[in-house]
Amino acid sequence: AKRALRLCSIHQKTCILQHFGKAAIRLHIPRFQCSLPYLETHSSLLYYMTTLGVSVHTVEEAVKAEQLGATYLMASHVFPTACKPSDPPIGVDTVKAICKAVKIPVYALGGVTPKTISQLQDVPIKGVALMSGLMTCPDVPGYLKELRA
């Protein structure tokens, strides 16, 4: 975490730590991302975090996360992804329903590629989160340009 924080500081980027809440508190990082079950068992995080993202997969989870104090949601995984080949994607309609059900920003994650991103065009998401595609592409600027096209 310290290394990631240094890199973010050098490049003037925001760092949001994930899953290790005690580390975020110890390092005085008030931005954290976790699963709903983690938040349910670590509700004291709310006292330390100014930004609290929660991963959700259903409308019910989204509503509960918002009630528990989430400041944004990560709806996943929207499309099929190599990271979770045996788990069915939640789909675009579920992401739309999540956006309608909550007042906080929702980001789409999972299987978002240049081929799938257009399916999110009319969904009221705040943005998308990229993982595998970005980490495995040989040309990051080109990949990002293709996503924005």
Regions flagged by a language model, labelled:
Residues 1-17, 36-39, 43-58, 86-114, ...:
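Alpha-helix-loop-beta-strand connector modules within alpha/beta enzyme cores
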Residues 36-44, 74-86, 114-148:
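Glycine-rich phosphate-binding active-site loops on the catalytic face of alpha/beta enzymes
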